[in-house]
Amino acid sequence: MLGLKGCLTILIGYVIAVCALFSSRGRNPSLTDWEKLKDQKISNIDNFGLTGQHLLEFFQENLPFLSFSEEKYRHKHVSLYYDVFKEYILRRANSKKCLPVDSAIAKLNKDVNPMPVHSHNDYWRKLPLFEGLAYGASSTEADVWNIDEKILAVGHNEAYLDPVELTLDKLYTGPLLEILDEVNCQDSDSDRKNGVFFNSPETSLFFYIDFKSDDNELTYKLLMEQYFKSLIDSGYLTYYDMKKDEIIWRPVTVILTGNYPTSLDILDNGNDNGYFESNQRFAFLDAPLLSLEPKYSKLSVAATVSFSQLMKHCGSDHWKVSLRGRMDSNEISCAKSIIDGAHALKLKTRIWGAPTWPANLVETISRQIIHDLGSDLLNLDNLFMASSLI
Protein backbone atom coordinates (compact mmCIF):
# COMPACT_ATOMS: atom_id res chain seq x y z
CA MET A 1 0.00 0.00 0.00
CA LEU A 2 1.35 3.39 -1.03
CA GLY A 3 2.16 5.91 1.62
CA LEU A 4 1.25 9.58 1.56
CA LYS A 5 4.59 10.47 -0.04
CA GLY A 6 4.12 7.93 -2.84
CA CYS A 7 0.59 9.17 -3.59
CA LEU A 8 1.78 12.76 -3.76
CA THR A 9 4.58 11.78 -6.15
CA ILE A 10 2.13 10.04 -8.51
CA LEU A 11 -0.31 12.95 -8.33
CA ILE A 12 2.38 15.53 -9.08
CA GLY A 13 3.62 13.45 -12.03
CA TYR A 14 0.08 13.21 -13.40
CA VAL A 15 -0.47 16.97 -13.11
CA ILE A 16 2.83 17.70 -14.88
CA ALA A 17 1.93 15.30 -17.72
CA VAL A 18 -1.51 16.88 -18.19
CA CYS A 19 -0.05 20.40 -18.18
CA ALA A 20 2.57 19.41 -20.74
CA LEU A 21 -0.09 17.90 -22.97
CA PHE A 22 -2.27 21.01 -22.96
CA SER A 23 0.64 23.42 -23.32
CA SER A 24 1.90 21.55 -26.42
CA ARG A 25 -1.50 21.97 -28.04
CA GLY A 26 -1.06 25.71 -27.98
CA ARG A 27 2.31 25.64 -29.70
CA ASN A 28 3.20 25.51 -33.35
CA PRO A 29 4.11 21.84 -33.87
CA SER A 30 6.30 22.56 -36.86
CA LEU A 31 8.27 25.14 -34.90
CA THR A 32 8.55 22.73 -31.94
CA ASP A 33 9.92 20.04 -34.20
CA TRP A 34 12.50 22.41 -35.62
CA GLU A 35 13.55 23.63 -32.18
CA LYS A 36 14.46 20.02 -31.45
CA LEU A 37 16.12 19.57 -34.82
CA LYS A 38 17.80 22.95 -35.24
CA ASP A 39 21.18 21.25 -35.69
CA GLN A 40 19.77 19.15 -38.54
CA LYS A 41 20.91 20.40 -41.95
CA ILE A 42 18.23 21.17 -44.51
CA SER A 43 20.42 19.43 -47.09
CA ASN A 44 19.60 16.14 -45.35
CA ILE A 45 15.83 16.58 -45.80
CA ASP A 46 14.24 15.75 -49.14
CA ASN A 47 10.55 16.41 -48.61
CA PHE A 48 8.61 18.10 -45.81
CA GLY A 49 5.29 16.82 -47.18
CA LEU A 50 3.93 20.35 -47.60
CA THR A 51 2.97 22.08 -50.85
CA GLY A 52 1.55 25.37 -52.08
CA GLN A 53 0.74 28.08 -49.58
CA HIS A 54 1.43 25.75 -46.63
CA LEU A 55 4.99 25.20 -47.82
CA LEU A 56 5.58 28.95 -48.14
CA GLU A 57 4.23 29.57 -44.63
CA PHE A 58 6.36 26.77 -43.20
CA PHE A 59 9.56 28.22 -44.63
CA GLN A 60 8.74 31.74 -43.45
CA GLU A 61 8.01 30.56 -39.90
CA ASN A 62 11.00 28.24 -39.59
CA LEU A 63 13.66 29.95 -41.70
CA PRO A 64 16.13 30.50 -38.79
CA PHE A 65 16.08 26.79 -37.97
CA LEU A 66 16.13 25.60 -41.58
CA SER A 67 19.40 27.43 -42.23
CA PHE A 68 20.83 27.27 -38.72
CA SER A 69 23.83 25.00 -39.38
CA GLU A 70 24.36 25.60 -43.09
CA GLU A 71 27.62 27.45 -43.70
CA LYS A 72 26.76 27.98 -47.37
CA TYR A 73 23.89 30.30 -46.42
CA ARG A 74 26.20 32.78 -44.69
CA HIS A 75 26.70 34.54 -48.04
CA LYS A 76 23.43 35.20 -49.83
CA HIS A 77 22.81 35.14 -53.56
CA VAL A 78 19.30 36.61 -53.67
CA SER A 79 18.19 36.41 -50.03
CA LEU A 80 18.47 33.84 -47.26
CA TYR A 81 14.81 32.89 -47.77
CA TYR A 82 15.18 32.51 -51.54
CA ASP A 83 18.49 30.64 -51.36
CA VAL A 84 17.25 28.11 -48.79
CA PHE A 85 13.93 27.60 -50.57
CA LYS A 86 15.49 27.15 -54.01
CA GLU A 87 18.06 24.68 -52.68
CA TYR A 88 15.28 22.61 -51.12
CA ILE A 89 13.01 22.72 -54.19
CA LEU A 90 15.69 21.89 -56.76
CA ARG A 91 17.81 19.52 -54.67
CA ARG A 92 16.91 16.40 -56.61
CA ALA A 93 16.41 18.04 -60.00
CA ASN A 94 19.87 17.04 -61.21
CA SER A 95 19.94 13.55 -59.72
CA LYS A 96 20.11 10.51 -61.99
CA LYS A 97 16.97 9.06 -60.43
CA CYS A 98 13.85 9.66 -62.55
CA LEU A 99 10.90 10.11 -60.21
CA PRO A 100 8.49 12.91 -61.27
CA VAL A 101 6.16 12.13 -58.36
CA ASP A 102 8.90 13.38 -56.02
CA SER A 103 9.95 16.31 -58.22
CA ALA A 104 10.26 20.04 -57.58
CA ILE A 105 6.81 20.45 -59.13
CA ALA A 106 5.39 17.93 -56.66
CA LYS A 107 6.92 19.92 -53.81
CA LEU A 108 5.64 23.23 -55.16
CA ASN A 109 2.06 22.63 -56.21
CA LYS A 110 0.84 19.08 -55.75
CA ASP A 111 -2.88 19.35 -54.84
CA VAL A 112 -2.88 22.99 -56.04
CA ASN A 113 -5.00 23.62 -59.12
CA PRO A 114 -3.76 26.16 -61.69
CA MET A 115 -5.67 29.43 -61.46
CA PRO A 116 -6.20 32.06 -64.19
CA VAL A 117 -4.03 34.63 -62.44
CA HIS A 118 -1.10 36.68 -63.74
CA SER A 119 1.66 37.07 -61.16
CA HIS A 120 2.13 40.80 -61.70
CA ASN A 121 5.67 42.08 -61.08
CA ASP A 122 6.62 38.53 -60.16
CA TYR A 123 10.32 39.40 -59.84
CA TRP A 124 9.45 41.64 -56.87
CA ARG A 125 8.25 38.69 -54.87
CA LYS A 126 10.38 37.12 -52.16
CA LEU A 127 10.49 33.96 -54.27
CA PRO A 128 10.46 34.93 -57.97
CA LEU A 129 8.86 32.20 -60.11
CA PHE A 130 8.49 29.76 -57.18
CA GLU A 131 5.86 31.72 -55.24
CA GLY A 132 3.61 32.07 -58.27
CA LEU A 133 3.93 28.36 -59.06
CA ALA A 134 3.19 27.44 -55.45
CA TYR A 135 -0.10 29.35 -55.65
CA GLY A 136 -0.87 27.91 -59.08
CA ALA A 137 -0.68 31.21 -60.99
CA SER A 138 -0.76 30.28 -64.68
CA SER A 139 1.03 33.43 -65.85
CA THR A 140 4.17 35.24 -64.74
CA GLU A 141 6.39 38.08 -65.92
CA ALA A 142 9.94 39.40 -65.88
CA ASP A 143 11.11 42.90 -66.80
CA VAL A 144 14.45 42.60 -68.61
CA TRP A 145 17.25 45.11 -69.18
CA ASN A 146 20.12 44.64 -71.60
CA ILE A 147 23.39 45.05 -69.68
CA ASP A 148 26.66 45.36 -71.63
CA GLU A 149 24.96 43.82 -74.67
CA LYS A 150 25.25 40.33 -73.20
CA ILE A 151 23.29 40.06 -69.94
CA LEU A 152 19.55 40.34 -69.35
CA ALA A 153 19.08 41.60 -65.80
CA VAL A 154 15.64 41.40 -64.21
CA GLY A 155 14.17 44.35 -62.34
CA HIS A 156 11.66 47.18 -62.42
CA ASN A 157 14.07 50.11 -62.20
CA GLU A 158 17.37 50.42 -64.05
CA ALA A 159 18.99 52.01 -61.00
CA TYR A 160 18.53 48.86 -58.89
CA LEU A 161 19.67 46.03 -61.15
CA ASP A 162 21.98 43.18 -60.17
CA PRO A 163 23.54 41.75 -63.35
CA VAL A 164 25.22 38.95 -61.38
CA GLU A 165 22.46 37.33 -59.31
CA LEU A 166 19.17 38.84 -60.50
CA THR A 167 19.33 37.74 -64.13
CA LEU A 168 16.80 36.05 -66.37
CA ASP A 169 18.64 32.74 -66.41
CA LYS A 170 19.25 32.56 -62.65
CA LEU A 171 15.72 33.57 -61.63
CA TYR A 172 13.63 32.07 -64.42
CA THR A 173 14.94 30.16 -67.43
CA GLY A 174 17.51 28.13 -65.48
CA PRO A 175 15.08 26.91 -62.79
CA LEU A 176 12.39 26.30 -65.43
CA LEU A 177 14.73 24.06 -67.40
CA GLU A 178 15.66 22.06 -64.29
CA ILE A 179 12.04 21.70 -63.23
CA LEU A 180 10.83 20.63 -66.67
CA ASP A 181 13.69 18.19 -67.25
CA GLU A 182 12.78 16.53 -63.96
CA VAL A 183 9.13 15.89 -64.88
CA ASN A 184 9.94 14.83 -68.44
CA CYS A 185 12.77 12.43 -67.61
CA GLN A 186 10.80 9.29 -68.45
CA ASP A 187 10.52 10.07 -72.17
CA SER A 188 12.50 13.17 -73.04
CA ASP A 189 12.10 12.58 -76.80
CA SER A 190 8.30 12.54 -76.71
CA ASP A 191 6.34 15.40 -78.29
CA ARG A 192 4.07 15.34 -75.27
CA LYS A 193 5.70 17.42 -72.54
CA ASN A 194 4.63 17.74 -68.92
CA GLY A 195 4.38 21.28 -67.62
CA VAL A 196 4.92 23.09 -64.33
CA PHE A 197 1.60 22.24 -62.65
CA PHE A 198 1.36 18.88 -60.91
CA ASN A 199 -2.45 18.69 -61.05
CA SER A 200 -2.59 19.85 -64.67
CA PRO A 201 0.62 18.98 -66.56
CA GLU A 202 -0.99 20.00 -69.85
CA THR A 203 -1.45 23.63 -68.74
CA SER A 204 1.06 26.03 -70.31
CA LEU A 205 2.66 28.75 -68.19
CA PHE A 206 2.37 32.17 -69.85
CA PHE A 207 5.74 33.90 -69.47
CA TYR A 208 5.60 37.63 -70.24
CA ILE A 209 8.96 39.21 -71.06
CA ASP A 210 8.70 42.99 -70.61
CA PHE A 211 11.33 44.74 -72.76
CA LYS A 212 12.79 47.74 -70.91
CA SER A 213 15.93 48.63 -72.89
CA ASP A 214 15.93 50.77 -76.02
CA ASP A 215 17.74 48.19 -78.18
CA ASN A 216 14.89 45.69 -78.39
CA GLU A 217 16.42 43.87 -81.36
CA LEU A 218 19.52 42.92 -79.38
CA THR A 219 17.39 41.97 -76.37
CA TYR A 220 15.34 39.66 -78.58
CA LYS A 221 18.51 38.14 -80.05
CA LEU A 222 19.81 37.39 -76.55
CA LEU A 223 16.49 35.81 -75.63
CA MET A 224 16.45 33.50 -78.63
CA GLU A 225 20.12 32.57 -78.82
CA GLN A 226 21.07 32.53 -75.15
CA TYR A 227 18.30 32.55 -72.58
CA PHE A 228 15.59 30.46 -74.26
CA LYS A 229 17.77 28.24 -76.46
CA SER A 230 17.95 25.30 -74.05
CA LEU A 231 14.20 25.41 -73.46
CA ILE A 232 13.65 25.48 -77.23
CA ASP A 233 16.05 22.59 -77.85
CA SER A 234 14.26 20.52 -75.19
CA GLY A 235 10.85 21.15 -76.76
CA TYR A 236 9.47 23.14 -73.82
CA LEU A 237 8.39 26.36 -75.61
CA THR A 238 5.07 26.85 -77.38
CA TYR A 239 5.55 27.76 -81.03
CA TYR A 240 3.69 28.83 -84.13
CA ASP A 241 4.09 26.18 -86.83
CA MET A 242 4.54 28.09 -90.07
CA LYS A 243 3.85 25.11 -92.30
CA LYS A 244 0.74 23.88 -90.52
CA ASP A 245 -0.43 27.43 -89.70
CA GLU A 246 -1.24 26.50 -86.11
CA ILE A 247 0.00 27.01 -82.58
CA ILE A 248 1.64 23.99 -80.95
CA TRP A 249 1.29 24.24 -77.19
CA ARG A 250 4.13 23.34 -74.87
CA PRO A 251 4.81 23.81 -71.11
CA VAL A 252 5.93 27.46 -71.39
CA THR A 253 4.49 30.14 -73.69
CA VAL A 254 6.65 33.25 -74.16
CA ILE A 255 4.80 36.55 -74.69
CA LEU A 256 6.70 39.72 -75.56
CA THR A 257 5.42 42.93 -74.01
CA GLY A 258 6.65 46.46 -73.32
CA ASN A 259 9.16 47.85 -75.83
CA TYR A 260 9.28 44.66 -77.89
CA PRO A 261 10.11 44.39 -81.62
CA THR A 262 7.10 43.95 -83.90
CA SER A 263 8.85 43.43 -87.24
CA LEU A 264 8.62 39.89 -88.58
CA ASP A 265 12.05 40.43 -90.06
CA ILE A 266 13.43 40.68 -86.51
CA LEU A 267 11.20 38.01 -85.01
CA ASP A 268 12.20 35.50 -87.68
CA ASN A 269 15.84 36.64 -87.96
CA GLY A 270 15.40 37.69 -91.58
CA ASN A 271 14.26 34.22 -92.62
CA ASP A 272 11.06 33.09 -94.28
CA ASN A 273 11.07 29.94 -92.18
CA GLY A 274 11.62 31.22 -88.65
CA TYR A 275 14.48 32.38 -86.44
CA PHE A 276 16.25 29.02 -86.50
CA GLU A 277 15.03 28.10 -90.00
CA SER A 278 12.81 25.41 -88.50
CA ASN A 279 9.45 26.85 -89.62
CA GLN A 280 8.76 27.72 -85.97
CA ARG A 281 8.28 31.02 -84.14
CA PHE A 282 8.87 30.69 -80.40
CA ALA A 283 7.67 34.08 -79.14
CA PHE A 284 4.26 35.72 -79.32
CA LEU A 285 3.31 39.39 -79.22
CA ASP A 286 1.22 40.95 -76.48
CA ALA A 287 -1.65 42.09 -78.73
CA PRO A 288 -3.35 45.49 -78.14
CA LEU A 289 -6.85 44.61 -76.95
CA LEU A 290 -8.41 47.86 -78.19
CA SER A 291 -7.03 47.62 -81.72
CA LEU A 292 -7.05 43.97 -82.68
CA GLU A 293 -6.61 42.77 -86.24
CA PRO A 294 -7.00 39.26 -87.72
CA LYS A 295 -3.20 38.95 -88.01
CA TYR A 296 -2.93 38.64 -84.24
CA SER A 297 -4.52 35.19 -84.33
CA LYS A 298 -1.15 33.98 -85.66
CA LEU A 299 1.18 36.44 -83.95
CA SER A 300 -0.35 36.34 -80.47
CA VAL A 301 -1.98 34.15 -77.87
CA ALA A 302 -3.10 36.97 -75.56
CA ALA A 303 -4.26 40.60 -75.72
CA THR A 304 -3.82 43.22 -73.03
CA VAL A 305 -5.22 46.61 -72.05
CA SER A 306 -5.02 48.81 -68.98
CA PHE A 307 -8.15 49.29 -66.90
CA SER A 308 -8.03 53.06 -67.38
CA GLN A 309 -7.74 52.73 -71.18
CA LEU A 310 -10.62 50.28 -71.24
CA MET A 311 -12.90 52.53 -69.22
CA LYS A 312 -11.97 55.56 -71.34
CA HIS A 313 -12.77 53.58 -74.50
CA CYS A 314 -16.16 52.78 -72.99
CA GLY A 315 -16.91 56.46 -72.34
CA SER A 316 -16.18 56.31 -68.65
CA ASP A 317 -13.28 56.88 -66.29
CA HIS A 318 -11.50 54.58 -63.83
CA TRP A 319 -11.89 57.19 -61.08
CA LYS A 320 -15.66 57.11 -61.51
CA VAL A 321 -15.58 53.34 -61.15
CA SER A 322 -13.44 53.60 -58.02
CA LEU A 323 -15.73 56.18 -56.40
CA ARG A 324 -18.80 54.15 -57.31
CA GLY A 325 -17.21 50.96 -56.03
CA ARG A 326 -17.97 48.85 -59.10
CA MET A 327 -18.49 48.91 -62.87
CA ASP A 328 -22.04 49.69 -63.95
CA SER A 329 -24.04 47.75 -66.55
CA ASN A 330 -23.03 50.01 -69.47
CA GLU A 331 -19.33 49.71 -68.67
CA ILE A 332 -19.63 45.95 -68.31
CA SER A 333 -21.51 45.58 -71.59
CA CYS A 334 -18.94 47.66 -73.50
CA ALA A 335 -15.89 45.97 -71.98
CA LYS A 336 -17.35 42.49 -72.42
CA SER A 337 -17.93 43.08 -76.13
CA ILE A 338 -14.24 43.94 -76.54
CA ILE A 339 -13.16 40.82 -74.70
CA ASP A 340 -15.57 38.72 -76.76
CA GLY A 341 -13.87 40.10 -79.87
CA ALA A 342 -10.51 38.85 -78.61
CA HIS A 343 -11.98 35.45 -77.86
CA ALA A 344 -13.27 35.28 -81.43
CA LEU A 345 -9.61 35.45 -82.51
CA LYS A 346 -8.80 32.71 -79.96
CA LEU A 347 -6.85 35.15 -77.79
CA LYS A 348 -6.74 35.18 -74.00
CA THR A 349 -7.19 38.56 -72.34
CA ARG A 350 -5.54 40.42 -69.48
CA ILE A 351 -6.53 43.74 -67.90
CA TRP A 352 -3.85 45.45 -65.85
CA GLY A 353 -3.85 48.57 -63.69
CA ALA A 354 -7.19 47.95 -61.96
CA PRO A 355 -7.68 49.63 -58.54
CA THR A 356 -5.31 48.32 -55.88
CA TRP A 357 -6.95 49.85 -52.79
CA PRO A 358 -9.02 49.50 -50.66
CA ALA A 359 -9.33 45.72 -50.41
CA ASN A 360 -13.12 45.58 -50.84
CA LEU A 361 -12.88 47.61 -54.06
CA VAL A 362 -10.09 45.35 -55.37
CA GLU A 363 -12.19 42.27 -54.66
CA THR A 364 -15.31 43.70 -56.31
CA ILE A 365 -13.56 44.89 -59.49
CA SER A 366 -11.52 41.68 -59.73
CA ARG A 367 -14.64 39.54 -59.56
CA GLN A 368 -16.31 41.69 -62.21
CA ILE A 369 -13.28 41.42 -64.50
CA ILE A 370 -13.27 37.63 -64.31
CA HIS A 371 -16.95 36.77 -63.97
CA ASP A 372 -18.82 39.64 -65.66
CA LEU A 373 -16.38 40.59 -68.39
CA GLY A 374 -15.06 37.09 -68.95
CA SER A 375 -11.40 38.14 -68.96
CA ASP A 376 -9.00 35.23 -68.78
CA LEU A 377 -6.17 36.38 -66.52
CA LEU A 378 -6.65 38.24 -63.27
CA ASN A 379 -3.75 40.68 -62.92
CA LEU A 380 -2.94 40.99 -59.19
CA ASP A 381 0.03 41.52 -56.92
CA ASN A 382 -1.60 39.73 -53.97
CA LEU A 383 -1.68 36.03 -54.87
CA PHE A 384 -3.34 35.06 -51.60
CA MET A 385 -6.24 37.39 -52.38
CA ALA A 386 -6.34 36.18 -55.99
CA SER A 387 -6.66 32.57 -54.87
CA SER A 388 -9.75 33.47 -52.85
CA LEU A 389 -11.42 35.29 -55.75
CA ILE A 390 -11.20 32.63 -58.46
UniProtKB/Swiss-Prot annotation:
Keywords of the record: Signal
Could you state one GO biological process linked to this protein? lipid metabolic process
Q: Which parts of the chain span the membrane according to its record?
A: none
Q: Does Signal show up as a keyword for this record? A: yes
Output the InterPro entries linked to this UniProt entry.
AIM6_PI-PLC-like_dom, HAT_RTT109-like, PLC-like_Pdiesterase_TIM-brl
Which CDD domains does this chain map to? PI-PLCc_GDPD_SF_unchar3
Q: Which residues form the signal peptide?
A: 1-26
Q: Kindly give the SUPFAM superfamilies that the UniProt entry links to this protein.
A: PLC-like phosphodiesterases
Q: Tell me which domain of life the UniProt entry assigns to the organism this sequence originates from.
A: Eukaryota
User: What is an example of a GO molecular function annotated in this UniProt entry?
Assistant: phosphoric diester hydrolase activity
UniProt similarity note: Belongs to the AIM6 family.
Q: What's the protein here called?
A: Altered inheritance of mitochondria protein 6
- What's the source species for this entry? Saccharomyces cerevisiae (strain JAY291) (Baker's yeast)
